[in-house]
Each structure stands twice: as C-alpha cells, then as structure tokens.
Amino acid sequence: MNFELTSAYKPTGDQPEAIAQLTEGVLQGVPAQTLLGVTGSGKTFTIANVIANINKPTLILSHNKTLAAQLYSEFKGFFPNNAVEYYVSYYDYYQPEAYLPNSDTYIEKDLAINDEIDKLRLAATSSLLSGRKDVVVVSSVSCIYGMGNPSDFYKNVIEIERGRMLDRNVFLRRLVDSLYVRNDIDLNRGNFRVKGDTVDIFLAYSDTLLRVTFWGDEIDGIEEVDPITGVTTAPFEAYKIYPANLFMTTKEATLRAIHEIEDDLTKQVAFFESIGKEYEAKRLYERVTYDMEMIRELGHCSGIENYSRYFDGRAAGTRPYCLLDFFPDDFLLVIDESHVSVPQVRAMYGGDRARKINLVEYGFRLPAAMDNRPLKFEEFEEMTKQVIYVSATPAEYELIQSEGIVVEQVIRPTGLLDPVIEVRPSLNQIDDLMEEIQLRIEKEERVLVTTLTKRMAEELTEYLLNNNVRCNYIHSDVDTLERVKIMDDLRQGVYDVLIGVNLLREGLDLPEVSLVAILDADKEGFLRSHRSLTQTAGRAARNVNGKVIMYADKITDSMRLTIDETNRRREKQLAYNEANGITPQQIKKARNLSVFGSPGSEADELLKEKHAYVEPSSPNIAADPIVQYMSKAQMEKSIERTRKLMQEAAKKLEFIEAAQYRNELLKLEDLMKEKWG
C-alpha cells in the first residue's frame, strides 16, 4: 500500500521547493540532506509530503518522549490510512542498576512499565515485519537500545488461513510459544481463551480481539471482534498473529545460553580469585547462580537483559539488535531538532558503559552485561543509509554529512517575519528592560528574558516583583512539571514576564511572546553561541510584533552571525509577502500547553486556530487536608483511584497529566506508610 497524505492545505511559500529538492535527493540515493526550516514554517508538513512522494518506511527520531508524542499525533493526522507507529521507552519510571564504590552503595533496578506504550512498541515492530511499505515510526532515542532478534520474532509469527488444516491443540501451543498466556476468565492484552472449538486472542499489539473457529482440524472462520460488545467487525480469509513480546527465544536457545553463562561464570570467578578479589568472586557466583535457577524454573529473572548476548547468540563485543534491525535496508531516517538529537545519540553509549563498568568490576554482573547497551554512534551511522536532518540551527556535523545539500525553508504560510533584532548597551539594561516590559503589558503581550546564571534569574525576578511586574523564573532547579505549569501560566496571563537561563529554546511554542530580551549577549560561550542565540530569538517569531533586544557592550561573532542571518531571512520573507499580497497573521492558539495535540495540529496551526488538548486542572490530592483524617480503607481507595487516573492518562499518552497523578500517587503511598507502616 502506498502512503496517502490527507490534508486540507497545499504546500505554500518555500514548502513546494523544499519538498521537491528533498524528494529528488532521496530518490537519487543522496545519503544525507538537511532541512533548515525556521520556527513556524511547517517543517513537519514538508516531511510528510516527502514521505508520501518516496513511499519508503520512515523512522522519525525525536530527542524526547513528549515531542515524539506531538510528532506522532501530527503524522497520524497526515496519514490516517497508513501505519503510523510510536516507539519510545515503555517505562513510566526507571531507576537503572548501579554501584557506587566510594560509599559501597548498590542501587537495585526499579521500574514501572506503561502497558499502553508496550502495546504501541509491539505495533511498531509488527507493522515493520508485515512487509508493508507505508510505515512511519516516530521514536525517541529508545530506537538505538537493545531488543530481541528480529529473526526470532518473525519465526514466531503465526500465519493462519481459512480452510487450512491445523490441529487446535497445535495452534494453542504455538500461541504459548509466541508468549500469549491462556486465561479463560479475564481476557486482557496478550491473553487467549478457549471455548470448545473457538479460540479468542486479545492481540498484544492492538485493541483487537481475534476469533478463530475450528471445524475439527480445519480453520473454519477468522474474524476480528469488538472486545466489549462481541460484535464481529471484520472477517478475514488469512491473518498473521505477531508475538506478544519483543524478546523471543526458544527452549533450545535458553539451554544453550545457560550453559554459556555458567562457563563464563567459572572463568570470571577464577579471574577474580587470581587477583585477590575473593569477595567479588563470591558475590558474582551467588548472584549468577541464583539467576540461572530462576531462568530454569520460571524462564526469566530480574535483570535478564544483562544476559541478552547469550540468548541472541552474539559474539562478545558485537552490537545488540535494535529497532533499526526491523526496518528494510532502504528506509529513510528523519532526525528532528538534529542539533540536539544527534549529540544525544552520540552520548548514550558512553553513559551506559560508565555505569556498567562498576557493576562488572565489583562482581555484580558478568562482563557480558556490557553488551546489553545502546548502539555506538559509529554503529548508528552504519545502519542509516539515508538521512534528513531537520533543524532551524543545524550543527556542523549535519552540514558536513550533507556535503552542502541544505534545503532552506524560511517562508511561513502565516506571513510572519523573523523578529527584528536590536542591540542596546548593557549600561542601565534593567531600567531599559522595565520600559519595554511596560509597553508589552499595555498590549497584553508577554516577555521572555534570558540570563546567564540561575542567581541572576532569581534576583531579576525579585526586582521585577518589587516593581509590581507579574513574573516568574525557570531554570534547571525548577521541577519539570512546575516549569510546564509556569509556562502555561505565562500564556494564561498569570505572569507577564518569564525569566530563564537555558530553558527558553527548542520546543517552546508561545505565540503571545512579542519580546525576547537577552542579557549579557556578548558573553561568548555555550549559552551565547550563534546556535543558542538563533534558537532563543526564534521564540519571538510566532508573534506579529516579535522583537529581540540583545543587551551588550560589543557585537560578538555569534551576535553578528545571528543578526545577519535573521536580517537575510526577513528580507526574503518580506519580498515573498509583497509579491503575493500576504499580510502577516498572528498565530492564534488555545491557551493551554498541549502534550498530545489533535491530529495534523502543526498544519492547522499555520493557517487557523488550533483545537489543542486542554489539560484538566487536576487536584493536588495528597495536599488536601481531608487526606490526613482518612481511615486506612479510605486511603487505599484513594490510592487505587489515583492509580487508575494515572493509567487512563498514560493510555491517552497525556504524559504530563499522568506524571502529575504519579507524583500524587507516590505522596499518598508515602503518607500511607507513615501512618500505618
């Protein structure tokens, strides 16, 4: 099946040319291209058009789970009839195993798995292995982390066909081999039940119930059934049932793995003893022996991923299997916000290795644990044959890889121009800033101020508050959820000014902001580099009155580059608007920060008011005074209710709301322990 792009809008401005150039590059086999698109120019819509033109499976890599969710929503809107999948870490909470030798502290692994995201991950791999070309997978950096061997996964796909001879009990055994669990009472995802000649399977990768009926040893019927009403939704002549888990293995592979693990255990224990590490030798022997007993009895153990190399049959030092192995060789990789995402991919291997070295050296894990890891950056590069880097400020790496193939997209369909940039002396900068703030307050517009230090952000906030300016600050010490709330309050008008350090850059969509003030703009460094200045200035690009003021005593190279580039873009944007009779239109957007917006939201936002997800005002349950007087039974009921609310929010992929409920849940559980132990 081919991609079918659904949109009420046609490409405008720079989009047609960008789409044509990128499409031609991919079809000609160009290994790397860069889409340099300014904020609000419709980069997602451009990429969607390219995907529809080339008709190849595509992986879209984002640097965090929330942005990935937004992209997933938008691509679902653009391709409602195609397979748009979502692949991110399925942990609601994850504390990795670690050992701190300085304090002799061992930290056990702790986690909570999001069942809904697990389903979406399985759906992604199932779509890729189905052989269809019209697959888009939106992923976080999780795509480079280890998972099961795709060939083992595919071997356990069950293909059935109406009229085919198949013993019912053989079919049931195959379901068990594919890690489905029989449950004739409570049928949930990944379970199956048997009633006479009818087998109902709740598929692990969808909300579908599959009903297979037998007539003796013949498959008599295959149909999808609504799991709630029991009504048949679609009959089938043939069907593929994909496994219920990404990590598949066989009994033979398990026995072989145990034998190899025990051999390596003997060698490592002997090594520790030879260098006088008797305690580490004893610890390792006890831990691995216990794990092997658990695997023999139950088929799994805590931390079984540290033995993945043995189960996969890989040699020491070889890379793990990952999501990229499920794609065909000719897939397209799109890296969103590449100036952030590429360094993140590069850093994953080093961080993981640093943590595991201590676990191996102090006898907590076998050396094979080092092979349960994310891809090295070089391995990632080898596996990606065609890449499009997407960024408003591509880094040197992307430009070098693209060999000069940079496709520019600076025209906004709304006609909005890049903000005017002014440079003013730092002498009396606060007094000057106060005057500018008052002008914006009169127009009911908002102001962002970026400082170099946390202390300065806090002191400036205090000064402005003393002068009756409604303001707040955000920096790395402010909790993530609190930051989101503060930014939402800025949009709602609770504050007129928001002050920050390095948090006013990528991903902040605040159309009400008409002024960005950059203090100490001439202090060269990471926070005042050309890339940082350009990203920060872009926060004023969604307002028709957008303006940037740089307070400085001199113009640095970074400032000059940012100013020159912004002026060049403004000239091009003005010329286009004049030639086409376009009057810049202020972006209108529902005043609430969207975590998982409506489908096609970017395309909608460019040309009309967007109906965004409105976050409910969730109560601070644990802080309610009545909680202190609850009985144990009432407290347990409140905990269970909060857990359900968290799970419902997570199921809708409303991560911020789910995280709020999770925090409330933890507070209630702590209160429960405090009162009743």
UniProtKB/Swiss-Prot annotation:
Domain UVR, first and last residues per copy: 636-671
Stated name of the protein: UvrABC system protein B
Gene Ontology biological process terms, A to Z: nucleotide-excision repair, DNA damage recognition; SOS response
Subcellular location: Cytoplasm
Alphabetized PANTHER family for the sequence: UVRABC SYSTEM PROTEIN B
Helicase C-terminal domain boundaries: 429-591
Encoding gene, per UniProt annotation: uvrB
InterPro entries: Helicase/UvrB_N, Helicase_ATP-bd, Helicase_C-like, P-loop_NTPase, UVR_dom, UVR_dom_sf, UvrB, UvrB_inter
GO CC term, one of those recorded: cytoplasm
Written domain comment of the UniProt record: The beta-hairpin motif is involved in DNA binding.
